[in-house]
C-alpha cells in the first residue's frame, strides 16, 4: 500500500453534479472515511488547507477542468493524491484517462463510477479508513 501524508483517511470529493458528489460521499463515508465535499476546484480551496490524504475530482466542471484542474489541485496540496473521474474518458472528447494520469492523477475512473472500483482505488492509494 502506498500511504500518503496529510490527514489519514480524510478525502475531498469535488464534483459539480450533486447526485454523483453525494453518491461517492455516501460510499466513502459508509466505508469509514471522513469526507468533505466541494462543487468545483475554486470551492475546494478551504478544504485543501486541511491537507486531505486524497482528492476524488470530476474533470469537467466550472473553473479549472481537465489537466488544469489536476495542476490547480496539486499546486494547492502537493502531497495529496488524486483520483480523476470523468464521463468523457474513452469518448474521444476532452481529457483522456492517460492525460489525467500524465498531469498527476494517481488513478482515473470513468463515470458512472462503480462503488467497488472507487473503494478499491482509495484503499490502494491511502489504505483502509482509520479505526
Per-region residue spans from a language model:
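Non-catalytic signal-transmission and effector/linker regions of two-component phosphorelay proteins
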Residues: 1-12, 114-131
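Receiver (REC) domain active-site loop signature in two-component systems and cognate sites
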Residues: 61
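Acidic, metal-coordinating helix/loop segments flanking the phosphotransfer/catalytic sites
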Residues: 37-54, 96
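Short amphipathic alpha-helix used as the core "switch/output" element in two-component signaling
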Residues: 46, 67-79
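Alpha4 helix (beta4-alpha4-beta5 surface) of REC/receiver domains from two-component response regulators
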Residues: 68, 89-109, 120
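Acidic catalytic/metal-coordinating carboxylates
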Residues: 39-40, 64-68
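Charged docking surfaces used in two-component/phosphorelay signaling
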Residues: 22-30
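Active-site residues of response regulator receiver
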Residues: 58, 86
Amino acid at each position: 500500500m502506498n500511504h500518503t501524508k496529510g490527514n489519514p483517511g480524510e478525502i475531498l470529493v469535488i464534483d459539480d453534479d450533486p447526485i454523483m458528489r453525494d453518491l461517492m460521499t455516501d460510499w466513502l463515508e459508509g466505508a469509514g472515511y471522513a469526507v468533505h465535499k466541494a462543487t468545483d476546484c475554486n470551492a475546494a480551496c478551504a478544504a485543501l488547507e486541511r491537507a486531505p490524504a486524497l482528492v476524488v475530482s470530476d474533470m469537467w466542471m466550472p473553473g479549472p477542468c481537465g489537466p488544469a484542474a489536476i495542476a490547480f489541485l496539486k499546486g494547492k496540496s502537493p502531497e495529496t493524491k488524486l483520483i480523476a473521474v470523468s464521463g468523457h474518458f474513452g469518448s474521444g472528447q476532452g481529457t483522456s484517462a492517460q492525460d489525467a494520469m500524465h498531469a498527476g492523477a494517481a488513478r482515473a475512473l470513468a463515470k458512472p463510477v462503480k462503488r467497488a472500483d472507487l473503494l478499491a482505488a482509495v484503499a490502494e492509494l491511502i489504505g483502509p479508513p482509520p479505526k
